[in-house]
Design a protein with these regions (language model features):
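Active-site core of metal-dependent hydrolases
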Residues: 170-264
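N-terminal hydrophobic targeting/anchoring segments and the immediately downstream early-domain regions
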Residues: 5-23, 28-177, 232-376
Length: 376
């Protein structure tokens, strides 16, 4: 230290000494900004329209009852409610619904099942994580539309019409034929509208997305996707699709996936902010939200996780449902923590968005539209 100091000239020393008061003055300002962001996040209804309290995408840690680390992440997340995927085949879907209802019964101070709109505000008040049970496919109903009624009674409130491939309802985003909504699909949408189940078009192909928007009498949702104009990716949506969705009162949830910007590395906060900026420009401030597509617990890139991640991607490729960029890290490193949506607040504040707009994007818009959708 003394040797380094001896090389500083008087002029340099004076400059450093003069800067010291400025640095000292800046520290409280930075702290105040951090407190303001934390306060805004803490008092807002925060909704992640695709997340999971356990493992998400990659099955590591192994799926099952919540671990202590996963429960700690839920407590610290500050998230009010999430759309948690329970879809599988018929038996698997019933089993997954029972699993999460069992976890909510086991940890009532931590989790609650969202069945009606008022349950979201109750989750905020009671400081529980509200679980909105949802499907990312319609395979479990096969061609029996009455199963929608059964699953509604079991607690399903959000249903994505297709995954990446084709089913009886329509075409997913990786289907080259790009067929639209089938006649059965139109009947499914009508029944979902009547029951009060949200129509989700996130993974749907371009034509099925357009048809789903047109067919739905209730606001259609795109719970976890992005803007194709910002980064060309089949899992994201064209501006015309986003405008049509917003025109029907729907909301887009911007995801945190590597599909938001160019690789080969991990996605970044800047990429996410560009997506949010563009979505607001195209859709308007009342039609943009968050759908991270992540677990509430941070991803730890252990050898076990990396092994399972490779198996996950390889398995999807063999089934023909793997999207481009899936070999990249499936998370934003700077936001790889339970309070990741607080990072969105910080990023939007740095971009000079107002408090009102930030509150809408981190949960207010989805909270509003779900009231309209779930009122049968």
């Amino acid at each position: 230290m003394t040797q380094t100091l001896s090389r500083i000239t008087r002029r340099e020393f004076a400059a450093i000494a003069g800067a010291a008061p400025l640095l000292a003055a800046a520290a409280p300002t930075l702290a105040a900004r951090q407190d303001e962001v934390a306060g805004l996040y803490g008092r807002s209804i925060v909704i992640d329209m695709l997340a999971n309290p356990g493992s998400m995408n990659v099955s590591w840690p192994p799926r099952g009852p919540l671990s202590e680390k996963q429960r700690d992440a839920i407590r610290s997340s500050g998230i009010t409610a999430i759309n948690v995927t329970v879809s599988s085949d018929f038996e698997g879907s019933v089993r997954n619904i029972a699993l999460w209802q069992g976890e909510a019964d086991r940890y009532p101070e931590l989790l609650s099942i969202v069945r009606r709109h008022s349950d979201i505000a109750a989750a905020k008040q009671n400081k529980t994580l509200g679980l909105m049970l949802g499907f990312q496919n319609t395979d479990m109903i096969d061609r029996d539309i009455t199963r929608l009624d059964m699953f509604y009674r079991l607690g399903i409130r959000i249903v994505q019409l297709t995954y990446n491939d084709r089913n009886y309802v329509g075409d997913g985003c990786l289907e080259q034929a790009n067929g639209g909504l089938s006649q059965f699909g139109r009947e499914v949408v009508a029944r979902m509208n009547a029951l009060g189940i949200a129509v989700d078009l996130s993974h749907c192909g371009t034509q099925t997305t357009a048809d789903g928007i047109a067919a739905s009498a209730k606001p259609p949702l795109i719970t976890h996707s992005g803007c194709r104009e910002v980064y060309r990716h089949p899992r994201s949506k064209e501006d015309r699709e986003l405008k049509a969705m917003a025109g029907k009162g729907g909301v887009l949830g911007v995801y945190f996936m590597p599909f938001i910007g160019p690789g080969p590395g991990a996605p970044t906060v800047e990429m996410l902010m560009r997506q949010i900026d563009h979505a607001i420009k195209v859709c308007g401030v009342d039609h943009v939200g968050i759908g991270s597509d992540l677990s509430t617990m941070p991803i730890e890139e252990t050898p076990e996780y990396l092994r399972e991640a490779k198996a996950f991607v390889d398995g999807r490729a063999k089934r023909g449902i793997a999207a481009p960029d899936e070999t990249r890290p499936l998370f934003i490193p700077e936001l790889n923590h339970p309070r990741r949506i607080e990072g969105v607040v910080r990023g939007m504040r740095q971009r000079k968005y107002s408090t009102e707009v930030i509150e809408k994007v981190i949960g207010g818009n989805f909270h509003r539209v779900l009231k309209e959708i779930w009122t049968s």
